[in-house]
Amino acid sequence: MAEQYSLFSTVYDMFMDNVPYIEWADSIEQSLKKHGINDGIVLDLGCGTGTLTKMLSDKGYDMIGVDSSEEMLSIAREKDENTLFLCQDISEFELYGTVRAVISTCDTLNYILDEEELVNTFKLVNNYLEPDGIFVFDMNAPEKYEEVLSDNVFAENRDEASFIWDNFYDEDEHINEYVLTLFMKDDKSGLYKKHEEYHYQRNYSRDEIKGLLDRAGLEIIENFEKDLRMYYTVKVKEGCKLGNIG
């Protein structure tokens, strides 16, 4: 996924200004405190440019951000010099110790196309979570791929950049291909240059997510849906801390 954001990283925050980061930060803080996590280390998997990471850092949590795009992380480091940001594949991440909680937002986990890699990600979460820790994440609902994105085209125009977003959904493989055509303004010439990036996400059903979590020794303790996004809070199942999983 690193190459996918090499150019888009420079305009990512501009086009994501409609994302409800404040709402997400408040909701995550509420979930953490509900489960007795008032401080300590929290891992943000797929942190991107670090907007949400910084908000939670400001709320008193010691954040670690992991993302596979060095370009995205360079922007994140500018926002928060006090947070540790690591350039790693989220399905193979390594930490120095355990964390109180793990979060993953903005359908980051849908970018993991292989279910075995997603299971491995869940197992790593199991491994690094403290015994009373929680994992808070979201994924796109199946209906978003099947009914909203499907084979539709979206576009947006800003002064500094514009994009055309083509979607191609493979119903058999459950893979959505995004072809992102960017028109970015060159500061020197004032002209717009065309760039293309390709992004891929997998549509996971609700039953698949539950089953993959179960394989990793995790269980859902809270779940709700809003705006075609599925929100989960999970914990390690009793007796299934990594090392005891069959």
Predicted regions and their residues:
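A short glycine-rich, Lys/Arg-flanked "PGG" loop and its adjoining helix->strand segment in the class I
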Residues: 119-131
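A short His-aromatic
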Residues: 110-112
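A short acidic, Gly/Pro-enriched loop at the edge of an enzyme's catalytic core
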Residues: 94-101
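Residues lining the SAM
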Residues: 105-107
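Class I SAM-dependent methyltransferase SAM/SAH-binding core
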Residues: 43, 50-92
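Conserved class I S-adenosyl-L-methionine
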Residues: 1-37
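SAM-dependent methyltransferase
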Residues: 136-210
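C-terminal lobe and adjacent flexible extensions of AdoMet/dcAdoMet transferase-like proteins
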Residues: 202, 206-246
